[in-house]
Amino acid sequence: PSATSGRININVSPQNTSIIHAIYKTTNGNNISGVYKSTNKGLNWTTLGMNGLESSGFDWYIGVIETAPNNPGVLYVGSIDMFRTTNNGSSWTNLTNAYSGTFDQQHPDQHAFWINPLNSQYIINGNDGGIFISTNAGTNWSKRYDLPITQYYAGCIDFLNPAKKYGGTQDNGSHGSVNPGPAGWEVLYGGDGFHCAVDYTNSNVIYMESQNGGIGRSDDGGNNFDGITGGLDLARTNWSSPYMLDVQTSTTVYFGSYKLHKSTNKGNNWTIISPDLTKGQNGRLGTITCMSNAVLPSTQRVIYTGADDGRVMVTTNSGTNWTDISAGLPVRYVTDVVVDKRNPNVAYVTLSGFNMDERNTHAFRTTNYGTNWVNITGNLLNVPANSLIIDYNKDSTLFVGTDAGVYYT
């Protein structure tokens, strides 16, 4: 292609290494923009047809191309679904139809294929839902191995019954578990799962969330959920939009898009209590990523927020006034902000980022509401720090979750 390209996937035919296929997407779009074939090791390319090859809007994230090992004329492409052509792209057949069946039969977002070189009817498909196998070239699929693994974005527990655990996962919904072990988990809320929270005075009240702020509430212990997004300004939302319960009044909920919202009736109604707490929209940046709250003796709320563009804000009067306290912090994605509930002028921030000019700058502490920040990264590896918690049973103990593991000090 002559246009600026984004993600490119390439396959070299195992039967004839002169034959190469490629799919690409442009930088200004999220769909497959073209399928190409070369028969002379890439010296020249021809465009293949895309009739029936449905794109997903997520091909910057997924997208794979393979040729049948014993027939380079048979081509497979993975997007949300898996497609096959036997006529150089004149027509494509959807082999998975992930949204038309159950996720035990197939799952969206295809990442990897393996086609048996001795029997091309036998295909192994890896996607966001696990491993699926077809023994008839994609006509039917079955989920295999049922590995008890998935990618969790966030988790929470029921403080009245800590055996009850909940979490939100990548493309596999939000889960809940009462019993230990993989058999004890069940899907409670669909979509991509993110933050969750349980009312600390009533175990039946559970909050869960799908992508881009799709928050819902259950009043019956997770059996049924109702959406509570009415009244939220969702013009700019993070993929994993943060929300939290008030530290003292469990029916009060805060939700962050690019503004902070407050509900005093468990999300039935919302009020905006802040201006834009980011630096403004800039591409995909300009959303709140994290928040934390505490109570002053005056009963005023102290709330800290962090954003994907590096801005950190604080209010010490329940949202009436806000102060930008980003000065002294690197300009990076703010992954977590945590206020010390015993002393709200103390707060911690963790930051993302790789190989920056300022090395070892992933964790900071303030003791004066963000007027000054102290770098407490110490001997943490120079990788993103994603979360931080305070051990309130031990005055000086902190835990930090990073891309390289969990650390404590």
Tell me the role of every PLM-derived stretch.
Residues P1-T409:
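Beta-propeller blade termini and top-face loops
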